Amino acid sequence: MQTSDGFIWYDGALVPWTGATTHVLTHSLHYGVAVFEGLRAYETLRGPGIFRLREHTRRLFDSARVYRMKIPFSEAELMEAQCAVVRTNGLAAGYLRPIAFYGPEKRGLNPRGASVHVGIAAWRWEGYLGPDARARGVRVKTSSYARHHVNTNLPRAKLSASYANAILASMEAAEGGYDEG
C-alpha cells in the first residue's frame, strides 16, 4: 500500500500524503465518530472507472446524517474530488477511502459545534487478502466476537465505531494463523 508518495484530498485541497494530518484531540479519534466509504476504481478502455461512485457518495452523506454531521462539501464536489485523487495519483485502478470526521474543538461526547473534515485517499490495491488469494485460497475462522444485533447499531450506515467487532475478529483470526475472521 502506498504510504508516503502521492496526494490526498483533504478539506478541499490536494495535499502531499504526509501533509494530511489530524490533531490528536480530534473528537472522532476519541469517540469513534467518523463515517467512511470504500470504493474500487477499475481500469477501463476510457481510463479509470470508479465503481458506483454516486451510490457510495450518497451513502457517505446518509451515514453522516446519522451523526448529524454536516459535510461542508456537496455530493458533486466529493465525487469530483474522488476522481481528482485517482487522476492526480496516476492510478489506472485502485481503492479509494473517503472519510468525514469531527475536529478537535469539542470535548465530551456531544460533538455539536465541532468542525467537520473530509479526507479522500486512493492507492493501488492488490486485493484484500493479497494478489494470490484467489489462486491459493484463504483460511478463515468463525470469530468468537458476535456481530451487533441490528437494533443496537445502524448496519446500513458506514460508521467507524461499527467496525470495532470486525477489527477484533480479524485480529483474533490472524493470531490463530488464519487469513480472515
What are these regions (language model features)?
Residues 87-94:
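Short secondary-structure junctions
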Residues 101-106:
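Short, internal active-site loops enriched in acidic
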Residues 1-73, 77-84, 107-181:
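Helix-start/capping segments and mature chain N-termini
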